[in-house]
Amino acid sequence: MAKLLCTLFLAGFVFLANAYSTDPPNPPDIENVFDGIPSIFNPVNWISNIASFFNPSNWVSNIPSILNPVNWVKKIIDINNPFTYIPDFLNPFHYFPKLNPIKWIPGWIPGLGKDRCLLPKVTGPCKASLTRYYYDKDTKACVEFIYGGCRGNRNNFKQKDECEKACTDH
């Protein structure tokens, strides 16, 4: 709590200092000659931040973050790591772990993750005749069955290859 209060107190000085800037505002009648050109061709950006020139996401101005492979690595690490690290505000080189619940949900809830393959076959009380596949843990194979259409469990696949892909290593 003390760290948070200290951080907010110091942040107030930063905002106050920025409010009383000594730089004169840009005159409205003078146009910026670099307006309208992409940021990669803008020499002002080269000077202010050389690292941004080498970042591929800045080469195309409207590239979605999902298409940037740099973001893939971070998301893969966050999903596969049981802890996500969040920075400590007063010490930028110190990170403390925050539990990532997505990593642990399959262990908490039966039927999620690889545990779904260990569930028994459930046809359900409804009267539909849908061809589905379930993983039989005794034979270690995906077996066809008739699903009633309601109140089944997650060991219920529409296609055999989907069942095999999810449950082959059991």
From Swiss-Prot:
Disulfide bonds join C117-C167, C126-C150, C142-C163. Its main location: secreted. Pfam families: Kunitz_BPTI (PF00014). GO terms for cellular component: extracellular space. The keyword Glycoprotein applies. One of its GO terms (biological process) is envenomation resulting in negative regulation of voltage-gated potassium channel activity in another organism. The record marks K137, D138 as: Reactive bond for trypsin. Serine protease inhibitor with activity against plasmin (IC(50)=10.07 nM), trypsin (IC(50)=43.39 nM), chymotrypsin (IC(50)=109.25 nM) and neutrophil elastase (IC(50)=446.93 nM). It is found in: Secreted. O-glycosylated. Residues 20-113 form a propeptide. Only expressed in epidermis. It comes from the Eukaryota. GO terms for molecular function: potassium channel regulator activity; serine-type endopeptidase inhibitor activity; toxin activity. Negative results: not found in fat body, midgut and venom gland. This is Kunitz-type U1-aranetoxin-Av1a. Residues 1-19 form the signal peptide. It comes from Araneus ventricosus. InterPro entries: Kunitz_BPTI, Kunitz_BPTI_sf, Prtase_inh_Kunz-CS, TFPI/VKTCI-like. Gene3D superfamilies: Pancreatic trypsin inhibitor Kunitz domain (4.10.410.10). Keywords: Disulfide bond, Glycoprotein, Protease inhibitor, Secreted, Serine protease inhibitor, Signal. Belongs to the venom Kunitz-type family. 02 (native) subfamily. Residues 117-167 form the BPTI/Kunitz inhibitor domain. The keyword Metal-binding does not apply. The record marks K127, A128 as: Reactive bond for serine proteases.
